[in-house]
Structures are given as structure tokens and as C-alpha cells.
Regions:
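Structural signal for interior beta-strand "rungs" in well-ordered beta-sheet cores
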Residues: 92-206
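Short, basic/aromatic-enriched C-terminal tail that caps enzymatic domains
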Residues: 200-220
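Phosphate-bearing ligand-interacting subdomains
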Residues: 37-98
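NAD(P)-binding Rossmann-fold cofactor-contacting core
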Residues: 23-42
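Glycine-rich adenosine-cofactor-binding loop
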Residues: 1-18
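Short, solvent-exposed amphipathic alpha-helical segments in soluble enzyme
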Residues: 19-23, 80-83
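Short active-site oxyanion
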Residues: 1-3, 29-30, 61-64
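Short hydrophobic segments within beta-strands
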Residues: 6-7, 33, 67
Length: 220
């Protein structure tokens, strides 16, 4: 099975595909598709851009992975364009992920060491980055981006086009509605209305110019 990656903004996908192809010998990564000529100079670790998105119209035996995902709406636009070209979407699940009794929508990306517990459902074209845990019976919509080291507790309901940034966590039975953006290291203990931006709790300096004996109070 030949696979092309859409977009060059997430070169880490190369390593993820290599992990999978080490197990699935039929899988072959053949290169990137990108419409932006400014990306031609990107470092692609020995790989190359083989064409623009419309390349897929003439290579319909090739599966695609959409790696444009920081903006869920841009991801949807690219997906719809690819569907017009007749693209077939590859659902990427890293071999280290645990997902028995979970359902995963077409074209989604599940990265290293993710845990999707029984009863979890993931909509189409959603992205779950490394070391994220989604607990039992939680429902994740389509075109979502969930960052590294996120913990979603049981029976959460996550709408479509939601971004949950790295290190965030939720309480059980929470709902995050469509289009909301959750900042880094956020703690969600209530429902979040649609199209909200939840800010991160930035670190702050509490003391300066401390000597080592003073620092030891905070380290030990």
C-alpha cells in the first residue's frame, strides 16, 4: 500500500510511518503533496514533495494522510478538496496505541502511546497526539486536534472542530462544544460553550536572584 502525506508542516509523521511500516511490510511512504511552493525548501529528511494535491486525481491507488491539523477548519477544507479528487484516506494508528473496543473515524491520526478506552469513539479526520488518554465512553467529534499528554476522563463529550492543547485534562462528564480552543495545561471541570477560547495558566516568577541554599527549599 502506497501512502502520501498531505502538507509538510508535521515532518514527525515520517517517523510514525516508519514505526508502522516496520510491522506492516506492505506499507510504503512515497512522499509529500503540497500546494504551497514556499514549502519546497522544507527539511524533509530525505523525502520529497512529489506533487500538488491534484496529483492524487491521477494516482487513485495511493492512500493519503492529511497532516494539516493545527487549524481544524483548514483541515476540513483540504479534506473536502481531496474528496473531490477522489482521494482514499488512510487511518493512521501507531502500533503502540491501545484502542481495543474503541471506534476511530476515517482519516484520523492516533500517535504513539495513546490509550483509547472501551466505548470511546473518535470522529473522522481527528488527530490525537502522543501519550494522550481518553477514558471510557467519551465521544470525540470530527476534525478535532488533541495535543500531547492530554487526559480526557470518562463520559466526556467533545464537539467538532475542537482544539485541546498539550497537558490539559478534564473531569468526568464534561462537554466541550463545537469550535472551542483549550489552552496548554488547562484543567476543565465544567462544560465549555461553543466557540470559546480558554486561556492557559502561564507560569510566573515568584522569586529572583536566589542562592542555591534557597533554591533547595523548592527542589527538595
Amino acid at each position: 500500500m502506497d501512502v502520501a502525506v498531505i502538507g509538510t508542516g508535521y515532518p514527525e509523521i515520517i517517523g510514525l510511518l516508519e514505526d508502522l511500516s516496520a510491522i506492516n511490510k506492505d506499507l510504503k511512504f512515497i512522499g509529500f503533496l503540497d500546494d504551497n511552493p514556499n514549502n519546497n525548501s522544507r527539511k524533509l529528511y530525505g523525502n520529497k514533495i512529489i506533487g500538488k494535491l491534484n496529483w492524487i486525481k491521477h494516482h487513485k491507488d495511493v492512500y493519503v494522510i492529511n497532516s494539516i491539523f493545527r487549524n481544524p477548519y483548514s483541515r476540513e477544507q483540504v479534506t473536502l478538496k481531496l474528496k473531490e479528487f477522489g482521494a482514499k484516506f488512510f487511518t493512521f494508528i501507531h502500533p503502540s496505541a491501545s484502542y481495543k473496543y474503541a471506534s476511530i473515524g476515517e482519516g484520523s491520526i492516533i500517535c504513539r502511546n495513546c490509550i483509547l478506552e472501551p466505548g470511546v469513539s473518535i470522529g473522522e479526520q481527528s488527530v490525537i497526539l502522543h501519550n494522550t488518554v481518553i477514558s471510557h465512553d467519551s465521544k470525540i467529534g470530527k476534525y478535532n486536534f488533541i495535543g500531547n499528554n492530554v487526559t480526557i476522563q470518562g463520559k466526556n463529550l467533545i464537539g467538532d472542530y475542537v482544539t485541546i492543547s498539550a497537558g490539559s485534562s478534564t473531569c468526568p462528564n464534561c462537554e466541550i462544544m463545537e469550535g472551542s480552543l483549550i489552552g496548554i495545561n488547562s484543567f476543565i471541570n465544567k462544560n465549555i460553550p461553543e466557540r470559546c477560547i480558554l486561556g492557559s495558566p502561564p507560569s510566573r516568577i515568584i522569586k529572583t536572584n536566589q542562592k542555591f541554599p534557597e533554591l533547595n527549599k523548592y527542589i527538595n
